[in-house]
Amino acid sequence: MATLEFYRRLDYDFSIYEGEESLRGLINEGFIGTESLCINEFNYLELNAARDVILCYLRPVAKINKNENSYSLKHIVEHILAKETNGVINDISNGTFILAMYSCGFRIWRTKSDKNCFFNVSDKSIRYLLFHKGYIVIRPIHSYEFPSILHSPDVML
């Protein structure tokens, strides 16, 4: 389990994404406006921590996944970070999450006039993160009623 000190020592250079056309209009709240990305508006601790969780658990796929948008995914990562940092990092912005996903190599798919976006992220890796990091607690009636994902030999990506 990572700690706050671990995240403080991470030092990924997010400034390399300034000027990226696919990030035009990205601010902390998400895609709003038309200005170029200004990395100084983002919290580096939150960016590095979110990036670490993403790299550890989420996997890219060929197609864009329209089941979960950036806003819903950022809540999952927030939950993990709140647990790992004892509540010090308990909120990350939508824009921070989007930039962290982009820095991990995920493609962005935007919808017109929406501050949220979708990514080419594996549903299986999202489910793995939800179940195995305690975001969703499953309490079956009988011990044999666990979802098949928990018994799948290929769930570890």
Label each PLM-derived region with a short phrase.
Residues 1-52:
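Intrinsically disordered, low-complexity serine/threonine- and proline-rich regulatory segments
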Residues 114-157:
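Phospho-regulated, low-complexity intrinsically disordered regions of nuclear gene-regulatory
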Residues 11, 54-58, 62, 81, ...:
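Generic secondary-structure transition motif, activating predominantly at the C-termini of alpha-helices
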Residues 3, 64-65, 69, 90-93:
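A diffuse structural propensity rather than consistent per-protein peaks
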Residues 80-111:
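Charge-enriched amphipathic alpha-helical scaffolds
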Residues 3-25, 70, 79-81, 144-157:
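Feature of secretome-associated and extracellular-like proteins
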Residues 38-83:
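Positively charged, polyanion-binding regions of nucleic-acid-associated proteins
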